[in-house]
Amino acid sequence: MKKPKGLLRIALATTALVVACGGEKADTKAPAAGAAPSTSAKGKDAITIAMIAKSSTNPVFLAARTGAEAAAKELSEKDNIKVTVNWLTPPEEDGQVQAQRIQQAVNDGADAILISCSDAGKVTGAINDAVDRGVAVMTFDSDAPQSKRFAYYGVDDNKTGQVTMAELARLMNGKGKVAILAGNQNAPNLQHRVQGAKDEAAKYPGITIAGVFNHVETPQDAAAEVVRVDNAYPDIQGWAMIGGWPLFTRALLTDAKFAKMKVVSVDAMPEELDYVAKGITPTLYAQSVYLWGDVGVRTIVDKLHFKKDVPKIIPMELVKVSKENLNAWAKQLKDWGFTNVDPKYLK
């Protein structure tokens, strides 16, 4: 697999940064999509992939779409095949709508489906039906492990929750009351992150959890929930955010109460960089969201065109982003096609 532009730069910049769980080093290397060499017999020369993310208003999934479309264009030119990505993501999170979009993709003649599941229980039946009708299904970000999907690409969600809480506990010197911001309560990946955060918090006698707070996954709704909780629980001293939703808006940059908190968040999108620079959120754990689409498309092409065997689980490693490597990460985002990276971080 071709390494996306800029990955070497950020990998070098983060060599010394260690994810605080199991001592694993964070990096941005995209894993090889196929473990076995391709056979001499080639498969499909025209592949249509229906991409169904959780929400078309969430910038992390727009980045994944960009990665998918870029990979499709590259592979089409390089390997003399026609790879098309059809974006079938609903405007808001809704597992039932996703199930309908899966059925739509099958009826439209898609060869494969690449999906991040809002609710595994609501899409597993539709995934299985698609596979039974000859459509290959791969999940990313949020899995449906009991389904007939052939592969999943994403972070270890339990570990993601653990490292987020461990870093927060470190910043708080192991004591204080914290809250967990958790997004969609039905999303299986977020459920695992919450459990990981809880398990990690239990290791610190001085850390207590005020609650787990779910919300609609838009920046505005997430920021409003943070403000509501801060007012309802004035003794909260820290936030473990298992997704970066409220930091996708600038609203909390001027919130005096929030500025006094210790905050650690998953994701590191362009909108979040100011929170790091100002010290409001000292640590972000980035998912290389562009690669959700890039690796997803390459894996599907490996399976359907090159007839490779691909692993059922393709791990993505988190990248620890702080002031020390903020500029390098900003340049990586720009290399991935983000147009809203503040120029001051690109110097």
Where is each model-derived feature located?
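A residue-level marker of the well-folded mature domains of exported/periplasmic proteins
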Residues: 2-3, 19-347
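Bacterial N-terminal signal peptides that target proteins for export
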Residues: 1-11
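Hydrophobic alpha-helical targeting segments used for export or membrane insertion
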Residues: 12-20
